[in-house]
């Protein structure tokens, strides 16, 4: 996906598991936060000032639009009460700012999340951030995210990948 809301973690569906994990933390349970509360795509826990984008776009009539960090959430996409919930000392924004390599280490005891992240690492994308908008990835990086998504699926023994590298 090329939308500003799509990123490697959401594309691989690893973010669904991360949101579930955060919703299971004691503070989240006490506040009644569901996995949806940890989504920047839905109302609830996202910053409503920027609608979870982390930025505000100022349209300029005769010049290029100006994009600035949201003053309400300081570019963190979520409300402060959501950012107070942590897993192993990190909040949801910290996780989105981790590289794949950092996240593989951080989630070493979460096999479902780890399996999806390891595939990104295996296709050479350990350096990208989990929350990096897909629109900022190169064409080759986006292709590798798509490949990783397919490789992360359960092996049926009936899949053939044909990779063509035109010159």
What are these regions (language model features)?
Residues 1-167:
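Conserved phosphate-binding elements of NTP-dependent enzyme cores
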């Amino acid at each position: 996906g090329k939308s500003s809301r799509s990123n490697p973690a959401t594309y691989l569906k690893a973010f669904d598991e991360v949101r579930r994990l955060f919703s299971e933390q004691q503070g989240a349970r006490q506040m009644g936060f569901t996995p949806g509360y940890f989504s920047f795509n839905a109302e609830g826990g996202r910053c409503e000032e920027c609608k979870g984008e982390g930025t505000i776009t100022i349209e300029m009539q005769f010049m290029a639009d100006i994009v600035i960090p949201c003053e309400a959430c300081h570019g963190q996409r979520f409300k402060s009460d959501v950012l107070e919930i942590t897993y192993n000392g990190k909040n949801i924004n910290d996780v989105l700012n981790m590289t794949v390599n950092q996240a593989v280490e951080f989630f070493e005891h979460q096999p479902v999340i780890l399996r999806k992240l390891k595939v990104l690492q295996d296709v050479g994308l350990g350096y990208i951030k989990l929350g990096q908008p897909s629109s900022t990835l190169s064409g080759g990086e986006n292709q590798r995210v798509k490949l990783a998504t397919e490789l992360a699926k359960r092996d049926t023994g009936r899949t053939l990948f044909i990779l063509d590298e035109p010159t």
